[in-house]
Design a protein with these regions (language model features):
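NAD-dependent ADP-ribosyltransferases
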Residues: 1-162
């Protein structure tokens, strides 16, 4: 996979929303429950060991509550991620590949694991896919500003320059 896509709205109707300036100020996109790669690795190991990864992924896909904020949602294609949002982002996820659960000595039914390394320990990008939503990539690690572009009309520009 080369890119994942994410749409967001500006603040309206009581929802906080985020502008590209706020995403840039935050340093990029980060799950609610993982501010670092090490936290994301630990979260994945814990959810797999507890047998709750699939249930947490389902809850996140359905409700997007902070309590299930082990992930942030992206689409594996433009159509999945875009629904008339005010802002549309492209995240560089070069090197992210589907791997077998055997890298964790586990088998999580209904879930696929994606890493940009050969193990969880040497990966800096970790994501999962719940089988019911095969084009919704649930990223568990922060994605920093330099890896993010924002759509401006018909062109993509680096978020750092927006």
């Amino acid at each position: 996979m080369q890119y994942a896509y994410r749409g967001e709205d500006n603040a309206r109707a009581g929802k906080p929303g985020r502008t590209p300036a706020r995403v840039k100020a935050a340093g990029g996109f980060t799950p609610w429950l993982a501010k670092t790669v090490d936290e994301a690795r630990s979260n994945l190991v814990t959810l797999v060991a507890n047998g709750t990864l699939a249930q947490q992924a389902q809850s996140w896909c359905m409700y997007k509550n902070k309590e299930n904020g082990w992930f942030f949602s992206t689409g594996t294609d433009v159509q999945t991620a875009y629904d008339h949002y005010d802002f549309f982002y492209r995240l560089a996820i070069d090197g992210l590949n589907k791997v077998d659960w055997s890298v964790m000595k586990a088998n999580v039914k209904g879930m696929s694991l994606y890493l940009n390394g050969t193990s969880v320990d040497d990966s800096t990008l970790i994501a999962v896919v719940w089988s019911v939503r095969p084009t919704e990539l649930l990223i568990m690690t922060p994605v920093a500003t330099p890896a993010i572009d924002v759509k401006d009309g018909d062109r993509w520009i680096p978020l750092s320059e927006y």
